[in-house]
């Protein structure tokens, strides 16, 4: 096989359906329409998929331009196996509410963890304070 270096190898994947995982945790699914040398992507008929437990919801986003430095994972979706998922599709409102509840639960657990460490004389620096030099 003849492999092309870097992002040039993605030229073969243009016009195929892809899943893109972004640095901020979002998951996008759409058709790859364009790519450049910096791995900037243009996705068409894009949906943002939100997973909570065994449920998922799709939010239509249309044409989506993704800066290459924000891409964590890019993978082609097998159209034949796409419908064989064990996940249940729910409405946008329902998945957003479940996501909010899940995030609130995680926040409460983190607060309890920080308080338990504080009671023992330990502390974890907050993530936003680590950015300052």
UniProtKB/Swiss-Prot annotation:
Claim: Ribonucleoprotein is one of the keywords in the record: yes
GO terms, molecular function: mRNA binding; RNA binding
UniProt cross-references to PROSITE patterns, sorted A to Z: SM (PS52002)
Domain Sm: 5-80
Phosphothreonine PTM sites in chain numbering: 129
Transmembrane portions of the chain: none
Pfam families: LSM
Cellular component GO terms, alphabetical: cytoplasm; cytosol; Lsm1-7-Pat1 complex; nucleus; P-body; ribonucleoprotein complex
Positions of modified residues (Phosphoserine): 123
Xref: SUPFAM superfamilies: Sm-like ribonucleoproteins
Subcellular location: Cytoplasm; Cytoplasm, P-body
Keyword field: Cytoplasm, mRNA processing, mRNA splicing, Phosphoprotein, Ribonucleoprotein, RNA-binding
A GO biological process held by the record: histone mRNA catabolic process
Function statement: Plays a role in the degradation of histone mRNAs, the only eukaryotic mRNAs that are not polyadenylated. Probably also part of an LSm subunits-containing complex involved in the general process of mRNA degradation.
Family to which the UniProt record says this protein belongs: Belongs to the snRNP Sm proteins family.
Subunit structure: Interacts with SLBP; interaction with SLBP occurs when histone mRNA is being rapidly degraded during the S phase. LSm subunits form a heteromer with a donut shape.
Protein known as: U6 snRNA-associated Sm-like protein LSm1
Organism: Homo sapiens
